[in-house]
Amino acid sequence: MIRVLGLLWDPLSSWVEVSGPIILFGLYYGFIATLPFGPSKIYSMRSFFLGETLYGIIAISGSITGQLIVFLSMYYSPIYAALWKPHAITLLVIPYTFCRVFRSLEKPSSPESTHPMNSIKNPKILSLFMGGLILQLLNPILLANPVLTRLVNLFLFRYSDNISFMISSFCGWLGGHILFINLTKLVSLRLVSFRIERNSPIDHTSLRRYIHQTFSVLLISYFSFYLGRSPLIFHRKKKDNKKKDRSAAMAKKDRSVAMAKKNCSVAMVKKDRSVAEDEDRSVAMAKKGRSVAEDEDRSEPLAMVMVQEARSVSFIAKKARSVAEDKDPEDEHRSVAMAKKARSVAEDKDPEDEHRSVAMAKKDRSVAEDEDRSVAMAKKDRSVAEDEDRSVAEDEDRSVAEDEDRSVAEDEDRSVAEDEDRSVAEDEDRFVAEDEDRSVAEDEDRSVAEDEDRSVAEDEDPEDEDRSVPREQKKLKGLPISWFKQPCPIKFFDPDRIYQPIRYIGNSPFHCLKPVMRTEVSQYFFGAYSSDGKKRISFTLLPSVLALGEKLGKYRDLLDTSCLSEDPYHRWNHTMKRRRDSLENEFSDRVKALSHGSPAENVIERRVKFSNSQGDSFTEMYDPLLNGALRGTIDQFESPKMLNDLIISIISNLSDFIEIPIKDCKEGFPNDQFGYGYHISEHWQELEHKSFRLPWEPLPTDTFRSLVPSTKSSRRGKVEPISKRLYPLAERIIPNKAKKIFEEYLSNIDSSFGKLIYPKDLLEMQIQEIYTKDDDSLIHFLWLEIAFRVAYMDLAPEIASCNERIYTNSLVNIYNRIDGRNVAPTGTVKWELILSLFTTKQIFLFESLAQHEWTILRNCRGNVSTDDSTQTKDFIDLYGKILLNEPLQFREIKKHLPRWPSDLMRAERDGDGDDRGPIQISTSRIRTRKVKSKLTLDFGKERIVLKRYHAESDYRRSLIRGSMRAKRRKIMIWKRVQPNVHSLFFLRRMEIPTYPKDYYDTFDSGRVNQEQIQKEVREKIHRGKYLDPVLHNTTLAEQVCLAWPEVHYFRGLILVAQSNIRKNIILPSLIIAKNIGRILLFKAPEFAQDWEEMKEELHIKCGSDGTEFSKKGFPDKWYKYGMQIKLIFPFRLKPWHSQSKKRLRLRWSYLTTLGFETDIPFGDPKPKLGIFSEFFQPIFKKVKKGLKKGLKKGLKKGLKRELILFKKVKRRLMGSTGIRRVSRVRYIDKSELNDRIQNKLLSETETTPMGSANDSSEVNDQFGYETQTINVKDPDDWTTTMKERIESIAIINSSPITGMSLMDSEIHTGSKGSFNILGSTLKKRLVQIRRIPGRFRNKSVQLIRKRFYSMKLMKLFLKRMDRYLLLSVIHFIGSNIKFWIRSAWIRSTGNIATIYGRIFIINNDISKINRGKITNYYSINEKRKDFEIRPDRNMLSMSQAYVFHKIWQIGAIDRSYSKYFLKYRAQTSYPLIKKKIKELLDIQRILDHEKPQDLKENDWKQWLRCFDRYKLSPQIWSRINPQKWRNRVNKQCTCYEERFIPYEKKKDYIFATVIEPSLGLLRKMNKRYRYDLLSYSYLNSTKELDILNLTKDSDILNLTKDSDILNLTKDSDILNLTKDSDILNLTKDSDTLKIEKRRSGLDLKFWLFPELSGKENIYDNSKFIPGYSILSEAQERKKIEEKEREERIKVIEERIGIIRSDVQNKKVEEKQTGTGEVEEKQTGKVKQKQFGLKVEDQKTDGKKKTNQVLVQHKILKDIGEEDISDLAGMCRILIEIEDPTKFMQIYEENINLNLMFLIIYEDLKGYEKYINARDSNANDINANDINANDINAKDSNANDINAKDSNANDINANDSNAKDSNANDINAKDINAKDSNANDINAKDSNADVPKKKEDEIPKTVVSSEPYRLSSIVNDNLLIYKIVSMWLKSEKIKRAGLGDDKNILSSFNLEDILLPKRRREFRILNRFDLENDHVGFFNGKSIQNDEELMGRDQHLSVDTTQRIKRFLWPSYRLEDLLCMNRYWFNTNDGSRSAMLRIRMYPLNVN
């Protein structure tokens, strides 16, 4: 049973050790989840109070259900999406709130409504349950800090996979609710109800009703507060067309209203009595305007004007009133001047407007209500007054500000001013939903009126009214969709409303071309994490949660207890092993399913795509789950269909400034935001694909109007002046106001342009000149910059897909002149040229295209007639192309961020300039900081306004007026003086000290530095306090005075009251109480001293900053600025007074409102400055002294008693006889000793009677002691007992008995003299023991520094002590017992044999236990032989020091503990290992490898063979053998550079000027090409059986030598195929034609099963599965396939013979007749007849390069789908033909010759591979028999093979036996026959007129065919080709599925079953030797002991660099990767190193 418990205890203890903290954390966080005391808890308590237990439990259950829903929403996303949408909770709360409100208002009619009803069927139960549920879903309000709730949710989500944490948290959460229920029941039922029912004088029913109403009021208040923070659910006031018309009409009359205001002001200046009446009139007008604006939507513009008028009149009235009161001559003169100015302006206007305004004022005078509020609103909006003249408006504003300050200071009615300030604060804080919304509506109306009035002022033409409507449409962007089409929740909410609280951040004055703020909101957050030793990007948490994660990360190691008990690598290795096993099982299951006949599409693992809630998946380009080459690139597309939306954003920002002709604006497109048609990118996206203009098609001629000359013309000698070229553009794009400024700048440009090289320099000069002026030039500087960029803009030298001729014609034939009316272009412009322009120039081009298309549409609509059906059809088609088609899905997925219109800040910008419009709005719509007061300083004509802001943090600044508070942050409300606004979530971080203690610092130097820094900081603080206390106090006092201006009066009164209470009541009462206590304690009273000290205390009135004023008087304006009361020599109550009088020291403090003291004004109370600060301290000191004295006396007495007792015990133990001396000791064998003991004992028992004691001298001499007999009743029992004991002693271990016995005798002999030496030795030991604490302290300090490893060390130390002490204590007890046996005291106690036997029985049991635990148990016993006394040793010569030394070393030293160091695998970083040991272990690789391999550095061939052998590209081997390989790589790149040589050698002036700036770019392209070669060489490196034999095939890639190039005929032509991925290599190697097929996914290697890696040639795709393959099925199928192959080859040989003869006959005929060219033309005509082809011959010179992309496009354009399908069918027929005669018959009937040659070529290729595989030296097929001339002459191009092999989805790409199977040959021909015809025509088009070349010119004209795929620009040509050829790929995939099942292993790669990422993971894990590394969970026995490891003499020279090379070599080199990363992926850092897809070749351990 004990063993079973011992076995169970280890796993149980480990589980408790690991899971204990998790369970505690779960209980803790589950319990604190119930702590937030919100409305649900209040509601539950109310239910307990009113409804007793039943109602309370129901309410609690509703709350629990709500909390469960919240928790489940974290794990189940649909619940979260349903509940936490923006307005879901609001829609849920609103009806419940209304029901609660109506229910609380109604009075209960019967007592049943307040008394409980104990029935579950009561309908109130549902109401209670829903109440608790709804209230729980809302945010807690009483707990303002949301950290607790977030923390609980975060932990529940983070540890959701830990079942222990979840169960414990659930238990804690349930326990918290149970505790709350019991506490509430205790409070409500036992205490409250008991007291209410028995002791309350109020009726029980009435009291319950009061409680019911009280809680209802609390809940309603909570609901109101919650709804006040949420946005309004309905739309704001909308402006329909009628409102806009009314606003436009009222805007015209606004100027007359302004004149009427000036007229009224003149009248008020003349008459003082009319001031009050006019003020009343203004009040009435303001109220009337507000009421009209609120009640009548249609009269908003009218109400706006009336409110403006009323406010302005009231301000002018105040101004006149202050002028009349002050009688200041300057102000009076200024007011008279202003009145004259107003009168002159008013006389110029229409008197009808004045009459209308007067009538309006009379009408509004009768609607006066609430005078104080209207005055406050009028003062709030005091800057509404507007005037045409800027100076008049400024004087009015300044005078209003001055008079307002004077009225605040001197007005008799001060309460009115206070009410005004309070009303402003209330309007801004409390009535946000009402007043600020009105201000938004009024501000919108003002902006509308302002813009429309500007248009009226600019042009008085009545037609301008029509212009205002589209301009208004242009400003109101983003019109919402129809209300009925929107989803249900969105119908009632406006996401684009203006009053959303978004802050305005302006970054530059030219923010029109730059977004002011971010317009997108991030939905996903990404972060870096480590995977496979690399940093990768993945999804992460919110930024707010990351802050908490950083804090928790510091304590993660402390919380993780598992790392203390086990190796941290164990868990990782175990996890990786499980991962590998799971992948292996999954892979095997999929292979089994495939072998059982399951379709491949069901077996292959599918990638997880990123999709939305509707199930729509992202494209690969936008899928964030993809990376690297799988995702593709976005920035390389250069198609006009995929233009970036940057142009859209720029045009939207320019829409307010670019002026479009009126006729285009009035007839704009429907739903057009800008008034001049869609943007060109959106416009082209809406067109159909076939109607889109292709890159080689010309654009409309009218688009040239927007293209200004952008290059220098070659036909003119000098440059045309800039002004003539810029002015037509300025007429179109620059506003009218800036034309004069622009003309002035143009003249400056013409004069200074000759001195400058670049216009950019002049542009910078103009910028500096503009910034120095104060006019509106700053605003219009943008147009000058645009004009410069448009006029002088160099074309980019790289034009996509353009050759030399197109490029030259585009530049030479560009416009020669341009004017504003007519443009006569002489050339064509194509998309390539447009795409190379800058973004700004493309904008104007697209604008012109939009206008052009709309002009055509308008003309067609005007000229259309019903009779002409053709014209009608064209018009309808054009209309549908432009407007009606659905746009293509090329838009980016974005989340819109609502923001205000772009003209929101316009009024504020316009207010900064000197030139103001007729109506100027001076009030800003963006909130500014709260201003406390203003101070205006006059310096002559200039004025400076000093503003005093509130010290309180204002989180509403930089927000739009009227915005709601739903999105605002929660801030602390208990600190009024708060310098910065911050969230409570980060409050804990702010409280961290400036210099926190670094608990993880292990260096003393760092601590010293921190201590020095802290010391300096303390000194600075100390210096600042005592050297300049006045400045410090003054600063704080000023801050507090500014923060509390309204409470200084009451605070001063409280301070005076506290001063009197302290001096007259508190201090005397304390003195009396103290002295009464002294009298009761029989002490003398101290009344005199206390009264004297109390009188010394002085109370002085001071200012707010602590400046002393007077003892009795008050400082000036104390009620406004505050005051302080300073206590000099404050009284301190003392328990007693000392006799020696100390010198008085000046002390002071300040009194607080609560009666406490503080050291600074407005400071916090200080406990050290209280009355009792010196009262308890002396008492505590005296008590401490008494306690110390008592403890000392008690300790002395106790020690004396213990010493006396110790002496008595010592005397009794030692006895008085001492120890007898033994004369001699000799060596006795163990067997002899046992026999003598046994015989002697037996003889004594036989001869001696019972009870007698006879001493045996012989035995006593040997053992050194005397024996006594034991009285035993039965002698037989005694004999048997002694025999058993002696035998048991002998059985245990004879050597310890003998050794110990003899050692005891030796010890006895040495210690027989006296105990003096023993005493001295004990004293020495006592000294050593006293040194132990010091050593322990030193070790403790070291362990604290290495605290990370202290726990491991302690555990290691305990394990060592467990073994060391156990064995040592056993032997120590045995030796000491035997030592004391020889004393006289033992002899008197009993028989020696009994005691000795018992001791060794115990030793036997313990030894059996320890023998299994201690590994070197027997070696310890062997070491003990040193203690044995030999006969030749002299016992007397041994000293006692040596004897006691042996006693202390008698315990076994367990040196096997070092294996625990090895177990932790800490390697050289372990801090507890000495440096020398580290070096030794590092050299011998003891900590890392069990069996290090003996490899040398120089013998690289030996360790290179350890790797899997691969055949690498020459680029890699260029570093291995540079002299042999370096030049060949460079030669391959030279041909690519030669293509750009003609660009540099051109002598044409225009061409040279254009290409010269791009030479650097060309060099970069050349460098990128070389890096492309290097990169693809890494990706496409192939495997070879012997890596050292690569030099044999080295000459294959050397294509520039004559010997390596196939001898071609004179009519042959080698094409430039470097842009394609599949390349035809025509090489001569043993007269054999070899075809190289290269692609990025070339034959994926069998990494999962290395035995499948067969021989592979770099130019041969075939593989041969070895005979030892694990795929037995493939072995069986291979035999069948070989037979079929042989039969098919026979048929192919027959076909070859027939066709070869026919080809030779045709050669003879062509040479005789010389009609080769005629036959070429005839064959072309035959093709045109049969297939309907239209081929245009291109006549170019012999050096013309073939543009492959254009040719492919023309082929696909000309060939229809039907023709291609016919070709495929014909190909199928030809393949099935077996009769040669029938084959020739079809051939004679004009069947396409290229198709025939393709079939022949395919058969030849298969036949050639078969011959080469059978016999490498066979040359049955000669290249001269089938010459390249035959292929090219008969229109067989290299693209035949190229198009055939270029399909990335070819099923034979990864086939090991694809070329050997019959079915796959058929499929390959069926699929690839389609592309052959297309490439036939390609070759014919490109080679029709190519002249013949000589054989010696061939090497010069050959462009090297690179064996690697190069990157190319994705242009329109390639896109169109891919789209057209997509159905071919799908057809190929469809046919691939119809193949024979028996060939599945030969046509499918097993590794493709898994995804690439999981495949790569499986490869790496499969290479890890996880089972043989002994790194899992293993025993300590398997680890070698340190003695064995340290004793090894073998030194292994395994260097670290060699290990790294062994892992990396020969896969890749890091320095090459860095360079390749920079040029291939266009990055300068290593952020995209993961995209390289480099395969790691691990070590192949055999």
Swiss-Prot record:
Residues spanning the signal sequence: none
Composition bias type Low complexity, residue spans: 1833-1866
Transmembrane feature ranges: 18-38, 54-74, 79-99, 125-145, 163-183, 214-234
GO biological process terms held by the UniProt record: protein transport
Subcellular compartments: Plastid, Chloroplast inner membrane
Keyword Transmembrane helix tagged: yes
One Pfam family cited in the UniProt record for this chain: Ycf1
Ranges where the record places region Disordered: 278-299, 320-472, 1833-1898
Compositionally biased tracts (Basic and acidic residues): 322-335, 344-368, 378-457, 1882-1898
InterPro entries found in the cross-reference section: TIC214 (IPR008896)
Keyword annotations from UniProtKB, A to Z: Chloroplast, Membrane, Plastid, Plastid inner membrane, Protein transport, Transmembrane, Transmembrane helix, Transport
Chain coiled-coil ranges: none
Membership in a protein family: Belongs to the TIC214 family.
UniProt function note: Involved in protein precursor import into chloroplasts. May be part of an intermediate translocation complex acting as a protein-conducting channel at the inner envelope.
Protein name: Protein TIC 214
Organism the protein comes from: Pinus koraiensis
